[in-house]
UniProtKB/Swiss-Prot annotation:
Gene3D superfamilies: SepF-like protein (3.30.110.150). The lineage of its organism: Bacteria, Bacillati, Bacillota, Clostridia, Eubacteriales. Cell division protein that is part of the divisome complex and is recruited early to the Z-ring. Probably stimulates Z-ring formation, perhaps through the cross-linking of FtsZ protofilaments. Its function overlaps with FtsA. The gene is sepF1. GO terms for cellular component: cytoplasm. Pfam families: SepF (PF04472). The keyword Magnesium does not apply. This is Cell division protein SepF 1.
Amino acid sequence: MAMGMFDKILGFIGFDETEEQQVDREREAVEKTETLQQIKRKNAQVVSIHSGRQLRVVVCDPASFDEAQNIADNLKNRRAVVVNLEKAGAEQARRIVDFISGATAALNGDMQKVGQNIFLFVPSNIDIANDTARETKEKSIFAWAKS
C-alpha cells in the first residue's frame, strides 16, 4: 500500500515509471525464478557418494574342502574374501584354491596371492591394484646380485 501511495505521489509530480521500466523489473523477476528452478533441478540430480553399500571383506581360515562353498557364496554376494590356508593340509589347500579360483573365474572376478598360503579373491566389482608383483619380480631377477 505504501509503495502504491509513493508511486501516486511520483506520478503527480511527473516522475512516474515508464512502462519499459516496469516490464524490465517483471522480466528480471521471471529470470530469477527460472534460475532458481534450474538450480533446484540440478541439485535433485546429485547423488551422494556415500549412499552406496559398504564394501565388506571376509577373512576365512578353511581347514577342509567343505568350507570352500561358503567362500564361493561370499564371492557370489560380491564380497572380497581373504583366504588363509595355513590350517589346511597341502592337498586340501590345493583343492580349495582350485575350487575358489573356478568360482572367481565364473564370476569374472580376480585373485591374487598375498603371502605364503594366503590368497585374495574378489568379485568383478572390485579391482586389485598390485605394486608388489613388480617388486617381487625384481627381487627374484636380481637375487644373484645380492650375494
